[in-house]
Amino acid sequence: MAVVDVVRRGREGCCRDLLADGPQTAVELARATGLHEPSLYRLLRSLTGFGVFTEESPHRFALTPLSSTLKTNDPSAGRELVLTQQWVSRAVAELPRVMASGETGMQLAFRMPVFEYLTQHPQQSADFNRTMTAFAAAELHAVAEAYDFSGAHRIVDVGGGTGALLATVLGRYPLVSGVLFDRPDVIDEAHATLTEHGVTERCEAVGGDFFESTLPSGDVYLMSHILHDWDDDRCAAILRNCRKTIDPKGRLLIIEMILPAGDEPHPAKMFDMYMLVLSGGMDRTAEEYRELLHGGGFRLTRIVPTQSPVSVIEAVPDLDGA
């Protein structure tokens, strides 16, 4: 989803024209346009990160010099847009209906959730996994350098994809073992990564469903770019499943971008729109993660920044709430 595409589709909701008379809240704009207010708020918030709107106070938006000059009939708007995956393009094209209904672009375009679509389309799934691996490559060493894993014994990477992050951590900590857990079709592609990093003797690869399956036991659970794929209820289900098997003295490490408060530019604001369109998930603020973890039986202990857009959110089992 290119910025120009979000800007163009945001203007289709007439927000620019409505804000021409002065700042308004997301609730007021939703009422005037008939759009789904939570989805509209997230769209407007994402655009503040690129100077299109400004959030003058919580949930209250105003025009910037950039949005004041946008022309709704400009034929060149969005002409540089390049979407490399056709199925993603189709989902993004549903953004106006997403804004009106609150459904995902995948549901509107394909009548199925994104991960069901990927399961049914192996080639698209393989391309998607390679794209995610390439995207996360810059984060791998940043996470491994920022967080001290030396006290870990057995790391379980929940939804770990092809294993690049876990393999990187195990490569730095030769006394630590690991378990890579993901869908069986994803695990099939992970063996090459584990072999390449020389960690196959210390790392199991287990297929399953992190909603339903009994997770492998461990003292450190790792989840990288998992929770942002899901809404709060589904995240709580994942966290509760982790809580069942994690060591009572263990740690849960969540690798995600954290949304800043206000209109500070941050890439998480744009990726939040991807989540809205593709999966119905969301990127979250630190306080939202704190509340989410509490609902899943964990207590947030600290947030460790890295030399990349992501942070390591550390949590421990909430023994008082057990």
Show the residue positions of the predicted features.
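Conserved Class I S-adenosyl-L-methionine-dependent methyltransferase catalytic core
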Residues: 1-24, 28-153
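Alpha-helical subdomain
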Residues: 1-49, 54-57, 66, 149-322
